[in-house]
Amino acid sequence: MEREPRARVALVPERCGRGPSSRHRRPGLLLPGLWLLLLAGPASCAPDDLSLAQHSHPVRPSDFLPERSILHSAAQVTLSETVPRSQPSISALVLSSPSATAFDTAFLSQRQQTQSTAEPSFFEANYGSVTSNEVALDDEEMDNFLPDAHWTSSRGVSPMRYITPSPPEPPQEMLEPGTTPSLPTISLPDEVLSGCQNTVQQATVYVEPSTYFGTSWSAFLTSEGIIPTPSRNSVLHPIEIHSQLSSKALPETVASVTEGAENLLFSSRISVSQPSGNGMTQQPSVPLWEVSQPLVGVLATSSDRYPNETTAWIEHPEEAIALRAHPGITTSPTDPTFSSQPSALFSTPLSSVSFATQLPGVSEDSFLSSEARGALESWHSSPVPSFTDHPYVLSPESSLRPHTGCVSCVVSSFQQELARSLTEKDMGSGDRLETLSTASVEASHVSPLSSVGTDLSELEEPQEFNTLFPSRPVFSFSSRPVGLWKASMDVSPEVDVSGIAITQVYPSHGRLSTPSSLDSTFGFSVTSDLVMSSSMIHLLSSVIPSTHFDSSFSLTANQNSPSFPAGKPSLLTSPSLVPSAQSSAFSHGAPTSSLELQSGSRLDFTSGFYSTPPLDFSTPAPSRSDELAFPSLMSSDPSTFFSQTFSTMAETFSLSNSMNLQSPQLSVLNPTSLEPSQPQSSADLLLNTVTVLPSPPERPPLSSSPSDSLEFTEVSRVSLRESHVHLTSAFSETTSAFEFSPIPHESTISTLVPSSSEPSLGIYAAGTHLTSLPTTVFHLTPILTESSPFSTLTPSDGSVRVTDHHTPVLPTPSSVIPSSTESISDPYLSASSSLVSEVSPSPPPTKPVMGSSLTSTDFPPSTSPELSTSLELSMPSASTAPGDTVDSALNSEPMSQNPQGNSVPPPQPSLGPATTSTLEATVGTPALATAKPPYVCDITVPDVYLITTVLARRAVQEYIITSIKEVLRIHFNRAVELKVYELFTDFTFLVTSGPFVYTAISVINVLINSKLVRGQTPLILSVKPSFLVPDPRFQVQTVLQFVPPSVDTGFCNFTQSIEKGLVTALFEVRKHQGTYNLTVQIVNVTIASSRVAPRRGPVNIIFAVKGSQGFLNGSEVSDLLRNLTVVEFSFYLGYPVLQIAEPFQYPQLNLSQLLKSSWVRTVLLGVVEKQLHNEVFPAEMERKLAQLLSEVPTRRRVWRRATVAAGNSVVQVVNVSRLEGDDNPVQLIYFVENQDGERLSAVKSSDLINKVDLQRAAIILGYRIQGVIAQPVDRVKRPSPESQSNNLWVVVGVVIPVLVVTVIVVILYWKLCRTDKLDFQPDTVANIQQRQKLQIPSVKGFDFAKQHLGQHNKDDILIIHEPAPLPGPVKDHTTPSENGDVPSPKSKLPSKNIRLRGRVSPSDADSTVSEESSERDAGEKAPAAAPENKALRAPQSGAPLPSSGNEQHSSASIFEHVDRVSRTSEASRRVPSKIQLIAMQPIPAPPAQHPVLADRVAETNKINKEIQSALRHKSEIEHHRNKIRLRAKRRGHYEFPVVDDLSSGDTKERHRVYRRAQMQIDKILDPAASVPSVFIEPRKSSRMKRSPKPRRKHQVNGCPADAEKDRLITTDSDGTYKRPPGVHNSAYIGCPSDPDLPADVQTPSSTELGRYPGLPFSASQYIPPQPSIEEARQTMHSLLDDAFALVAPSSQPTNAMGAGTGVPASLPVNSTPSREERRATQWGSFYSPAQTANNPCSRYEDYGMTPPSGPLPSRPSFGPGLLPSSELVPPEPPQPQSSTDAPYAARGIYSEEMPSVARPRPVGGTTGSQIQHLTQVGIASRIGAQPVEIPAGRGSQYGGPGWPVYGEEEAGRREATHMLGHQEYSSSPLFQVPRTSGREPSAPPGNLAHRGLQGPGLGYPTSSTEDLQPGHSSASLIKAIREELLRLSQKQGSVQNFHS
């Protein structure tokens, strides 16, 4: 039967033209259903439809409807009597509204199928209508009122019909008929209004008949207009109520139901009932039905009360829908199916309403009334019979069972729907479907309940009803429906408390009140009722308050009436139920508009209903505020509930969630309010639970006997009714109404208490008792007490609510709550341990207070816990404000409720209640808001502000009060008032000043320093705050720098702002640590400065932080907060912070003197007294010392930082003491523990700390440190470390310098001595001779090397300086620059090393050895021979010597053809040596001359020696030269290059050079013939000439042409020794200095030589043999292979040294640098443009680089920049050396500098070695005279196979290259030197690269090598060289002359 009616209901909604609504719900599941309902509403709302709806709606309105249908058995008559068509139409209406929404398509189809039963149909339809409305709102999301409007039409018609029938029917009869009207009513509001306008009109009429409700209805209708939200609601409930209640009650009831969802309806009905008040049992049922119709009136009344709400409904259709969908509406059409949720709620309420007298009818009719009144006791008592009756009539059990399933399901489905947003969108119909689906689950949960008893089913129905309520609440009736729904939730928890179904209840939902109901016949029903009573029951209670509110509803009823007057606030009552989430949502929604109004009106109204639950609802209302607060904390209160409170009752919780979701729908309208709303719902649920609690106790007796239940109900009813009447009559006077109500509660409660044998009952009884007590003690207090179980139920809430109905409930409860909370806690526990236990668990999840008041098993766990938790945190600090906002928002929506709503929220913040703290907090807030709390802080829970004093016996309280006021007035400088809470043993009071409340601590701080406490005869023995002060170890201290004078730190708002800031800061620092709930408790606030100061401070704030596990250690909080910077922390607190957070009590380690061995002492300077006396100083120093320890590892070993205990070290300050002395010294004594907790010894600790830099330590510590950072206390005389350090410094400062100096001296000595030895070794000549003999093949190398050496050196020099100038070459130069750049210095050193090495390893080769010896000889001879050239020559010699070493290697390389890189390097190095040797042979005579010229005896001696050796070997040398020359001539290279040089060089200079060279050669050949002076001059010229290399170097320096020539020669040399090419070629390319190289550019080379002849060294001595550069090119290809390899290297190295480093110096010696520069310039000018092009110099010029001020390197192009640079740079330095005429010194230097260059170049190839030999013999002097800038390397490069190419190709190429410049070189074969470079790489890369740059591609080395190949005899080579040198000397002579 149930299912059929449900199906019908579903059908009806379809027909009830709710299409739009259903579409809107579509978003939810409900839209289609609504649409169908709307469509089916008027016409198709047939009983079948209703049946179908009922049948299919086990989950949604139809569930509630079934009950209504059952109830309607009585009301049915009325319906039929009123209008048979009305029933069907009503059914259609109802179905369309709720069933369409709830059932959606499925339900609709079912409803269509099962429209058989009119009563069920009506109930179903009516309820469905409500659901549809809810759906519409949900769809609208509070935005869409079209559905409302559409539904309104339907509803209007249907509700009117129903209303009409309802009033006529007697309450009992009307149970069933009433059910039908109920359905129409519901449909009327949403769809029926438009669909069933007639009915609506009737309803309106009824409303008008209802004194108050009629007005409301009118208003509601007016405000709603087409929107039949009021009608719909009123229709639904009013019809039911109508059945129960008398016709006169019906109009009001209808209005109430319509407008306030069930709550409004009840309120109206209660009003009516109370007025009718007769036979509350029976009369109430009629009034209920009347209320159903009056519901319309009530709606109107509500509208009147809160036209805003009506407006709100209109504004927020969703809200309206929610209300309509709300169980209130849903309940009214309680079908067996609908009953599941709505029915159960309504059915129970109806039962309650019906009471014993009208059990069957009343049960059904009571369904509404029981919701309203049965919410509490009468609900419980009557529900059993009622349910029984109803089930019997409508097969209530069936409906109940399905209902139970539905209720759970509905709740579940609601949540699910919400989750799906189906429910949200179509709370009405979609919800139903959801409900159905969840019904099975819920049913499963419920089934145990059901098994418990038949009532369980019914209760389940109420649960289902609740689900509908949530849907309805979505609609404009959402508030009330929410209330109902919430009530259901509450009930279920209560049921759980009741006992049998506790577990089941939880599983099913908070609403599993069904289990409760099952448990006690009406227990379950009660639970349902309670749930409904939370919202719907409240409505019912308002209709039939006395019964329901008995214990909890008495107040509720009273409040209900006031609520109703308040307006929709009564609807808001619903929030007290789980719907409170929805209600809360609606409350929030109300802020949105409709929701708020509904919230305010309904909730308040509900509050009225709930007065006891009201307290509950009062909590709901406060909840609204609380919710606002809560929402801020937990926007998804329902979900929280679900998880926490309803974890067991997932489904029930789901419903709650659903409500919440609906709330969110409302939320959609007003998301802000929604969120708060959800939290509110939690609170509401708790409150509801409270409400339930009182009722269940009553009920349990009822369950034992239905009649008992009825009796209880009656008693309750009477009391409630009385109070309710009072309330109603004094709507505005909440207090009076409440007062009355509380008394009835007391009476009722008394009954309930005894009757409550079950734990639930016990709980309820406890709640009731509390209520009674508060009633007796304090009207508000009694209410609070009653509410105390629900915290919100505090009478204050009730009275306040009545008074500030809109803000209601919340404000009122706040004041009462504190008392009630305590009372409740105890009574609760005492009344029933089971209940207590339940309550206890709840508080933990929620608030401590709240939890205790609520049963943990009860819905409170589900609702309360989360909400509580949210409330707890949010409420205290922000609850009031948020709540206020929400409330105001809600109230805003309902105009009347707004103000109160605003008031209420502020109280919410208070967290006062401990047991019912959450609820209390919620209620407490309302209490504050009771009169729109005049205080800026919520004193609802005044614990924070209460001061408890123990008075002396002689103290007179009046006097004490006056004295305290006076003391405080004087201190605070403003008038204060004392609010005394207790006058006896403990004098408890709080202090206010205008709107401000002084914190307890601020008052205590004043009193304890006053005479009242400290006087000789104190009147006050002790003063303490009423709250518990945490242990000091939990306390944390924060110091504000100051507060503005306008800020009074004693005011509550200051501490609240600080608490809020601290919570925010804690959240910030812990946001990454997961979720957490922390509350801050301000323990003390003290301020230092006087009130007068412009800045009052510092302000010390001591607080404690409480988490879920209790208080957190102060050190832990301090560590957390100190992660913030002072600025950040100041930002959070809103005031500048001086000290972030320090533990109030610091942990102390073992400070025993026995552990003194671990104590460390540090003395700080500059610590002022203020800092020293700061209590934080030791802690700060501990932290800084720990940081200092963390620095130790970092300082010591960064990579081991992690392994050190740095951050893990623990420092404990033992003592801080002031010392005598200057600068405020302070001694810190402390010890250190490592990360393992092991104490470190003082020595170890101090050693660790002392590893940190003193300055760093001072920075970290923030103070200067005296002496050592740390020293053991036991050994204060710890100078040992100092003395050790001092000793160490002595060692470091003395020993190390001594060692360094010694090493330097040794090195210098070794270098100098070694150089001298090398240079002056007497066996040099012999060696040279031998070498030359051996070098015969290397004679080629000799000449070539000479040239190359000179040029090579030039190259090095060029390279050195050129690199920058020459971009392209620079790269190569860079590499060569290793030889070149470094050459100046590097070359020198390397050269020296190489030279030494060469000498050291004379075993290079036969030639190498001989070369070495010859080099030595040359080195010695050359200097001697050319004293003049000593300076230059010395460098040259020096260079050559080193070069000789290199040459040796080079020679070896040359001969062995070892890797060219090595050869190149060696060539460069060796070439100088060889050159020296070779040069020395010719030099021997010149040296003698040279010394004369040089004026240096040593030089002369050396020269003489060299000359002697040279003479001895002259023939051999000449022979070699001749061979070389001949070879070159044969090849045509020798002469040709010479020709070039001559042609290109300065003819005069070259001639001069040549002459000098010739003379030198002659002297060498004929030592006797050589005259020192002449020889020297010739030598100079000869060297210059003969070492065109030097000239070339200079030329290279001065002119790239020479460099090229050299390169050409080098190429030739490289022919044999290609290694040098890279370097040597480069060098040569710079400016050919080789006699042969000059072949191409020999003119330049000769010129250079001419230039250089002035140089101390007679570079041209060997030049004579050298043909012109052109010849050299031709002949030297062959000769230079040998000669250049030998000559060029040494001459070049020398030159390189001289040129690079030495040449300039050497030259300067003979010729000032200016001369060199002049030469360079001359070179530049000297060379003809063609030559310039050909000449490196010209190239140099081509590069755009002017020849270096010094003679441009022969290969300027290569390194014109390099060589020139080298020369330029070196020239001057070398000059001094030359000036010094320290050939050796210069040579040494050059040997160091140049040799590196020179050697590197020669090292490149064997040619280098050969050249070195030659160079040693002849070029050494030349090198001395002019370091061959074109090093042997260059020579070798030139001497390379490419030499011929250079000679021919290279000539042009070189020209081109010169023209092109270095870049061209790099691209040109010269730059191909890489192979040469490859050789030279062994040579310093600098040279190599340089050479490479100059002539990487030059084939000189090859060709020169070829030329120099051993094929030529020494004599022929020498002869050829001599000839070439002669030519070159001529050319160079002119050049030199020109330069000179």
Swiss-Prot record:
Modification type Phosphoserine: residues: 1377, 1384, 1543-1544, 1613
Top-rank taxon: Eukaryota
Residue ranges of the region described as Disordered: 788-917, 1362-1451, 1579-1599, 1695-1782, 1863-1915
Pfam family, one: KIAA1549
Topology of the protein relative to the lipid bilayer: Multi-pass membrane protein
Function comment: May play a role in photoreceptor function.
Family: Belongs to the UPF0606 family.
Protein name: UPF0606 protein KIAA1549
